[in-house]
Amino acid sequence: MARENKKELIGRVVSDKMSKTIVVEIVQRKMHPIYHKYLKVSKKVKAHDEKEVSKVGDKVKIIEVRPISKDKRWSLVEVLEKLK
């Protein structure tokens, strides 16, 4: 049975130096459990960019896919906003 509920994330491209691979930084706001203050938490993930359309600074949407390599478990869906 195929799993249809795949995670989608939106983030900024911070590196496109690898062939068909981009590094996307995802920034989320999480509340501290004791101090109840919102903190910015970021993580970087590698995503597959088959057509190499995204550049550094672009806002992109990525989706969870089967493992492509040791580090890649995400794939580019679309470029939401190009950097000018």
Swiss-Prot record:
The record's section on Gene3D superfamilies has: Nucleic acid-binding proteins
CDD domains reported for this sequence: Ribosomal_uS17 (cd00364)
Give the GO terms filed under biological process for this record: translation
Q: Extract the InterPro entries matched here.
A: NA-bd_OB-fold (IPR012340), Ribosomal_uS17 (IPR000266), Ribosomal_uS17_bact/chlr (IPR019984), Ribosomal_uS17_CS (IPR019979)
Q: Which GO terms describe its molecular function?
A: rRNA binding; structural constituent of ribosome
One Pfam family here: Ribosomal_S17
Keyword vocabulary terms for this entry: Ribonucleoprotein, Ribosomal protein, RNA-binding, rRNA-binding
Q: GO cellular component terms?
A: cytosolic small ribosomal subunit
Provide the family line: Belongs to the universal ribosomal protein uS17 family.
Q: Which HAMAP family match?
A: Ribosomal_uS17_B
Relate the protein's function as given in its record.
One of the primary rRNA binding proteins, it binds specifically to the 5'-end of 16S ribosomal RNA.
Subunit and partners: Part of the 30S ribosomal subunit.
Cite the NCBIfam families for this sequence.
PRK05610.1, uS17_bact
The protein's matches in PANTHER family, at most eight in alphabetical order, are given as:
40S RIBOSOMAL PROTEIN S11 FAMILY MEMBER, SMALL RIBOSOMAL SUBUNIT PROTEIN US17M
- The entry's protein name is Small ribosomal subunit protein uS17
Q: Which organism is it from?
A: Borreliella afzelii (strain PKo)
